[in-house]
Amino acid sequence: MAIEVIDNFLDKDEFNKIQSCMISNNFPWFYSDYVSHEDEKNKFYFTHSFYKDLKPQSVFFTMLDNLLNKLEIKSLIRVKGNLHTKSNKIKYNNFHTDFSYKHKGCILYINDNNGFTYFKESDKKV
């Protein structure tokens, strides 16, 4: 699995528009009991589904138009926002694969924090 990190992928105005919306009090986040596997205990987070099942799921989907166009996507599968709450220590979640078939993924970090995404196959922290 090749991992490419592109700092400042979006211009500052575009990024600020998305960030301001997603961290506002008016942006809806939905509770999820588990992060990667249903049998996980005490590992919750919040999600927002922008796109799933071949159609937009959110009125906020169009906010991501410039980002998605810049990615030059062949076929869109899912667009989802994840929100993990603040913690005094780093919490590790179970490894998982989003889909069982060949695909590419994209992660856009909305804020700087002391956390990271760890990729097992490449032993890389991003």
Where are these regions (language model features)?
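Non-heme Fe(II)/2-oxoglutarate
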Residues: M1-K74
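Catalytic core of non-heme Fe(II) oxygenases with the double-stranded beta-helix
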Residues: Y51-V126
